[in-house]
């Protein structure tokens, strides 16, 4: 996967700093704040009970920009979040936001977006996309703790594998599945053989990871079937037992 250009990286950094400057104190709400491909969005964050996904634009159309508007809309719609464009302009060698305030405009309506105005007290149940993205974060942080070098990762529940990393003998892939505690018994997907058969064509070793999520108001009761719903911004209890090596993938 192609690396981003230095010019885009500089623009991206300026956009991120602008977002951080909109809040008092340290900004701790980033969902995506890295330049590792693939790119559905360039930046994303949670504020209150709302999610915001950002695609950077160059108003002069001279910047080589990774990803697409289609990708932005897919992750925003899949997560029940807001798809935002962030127009940027290079002036005297420095990148600046064109739109006022947060610098965001709706990708669907073209109106200015102020994230603070969209926060509410509504309890919003986490989408499958949010949970998958969270599960991938759990697995990759565990890999990094074990000293593994990550190559790429993505949080879409509709794409496999979720993670590539450098193993002891070369690149390895990880298929990640997340489960809501008490709703579905964890198991490999029904099309598991097809997934693995396809990934075997890469010639790389494979792994499988299950992440089970429960509400902070819930407990991991193996016999329970009345698990509490998972609401955005309320935290999660997690059960993750590590990678399962796929030594005989089609069995």
Regions found by a protein language model. Give the residues of each.
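Short N-terminal signal/transit or membrane-insertion segments
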Residues: 16-38, 88-107
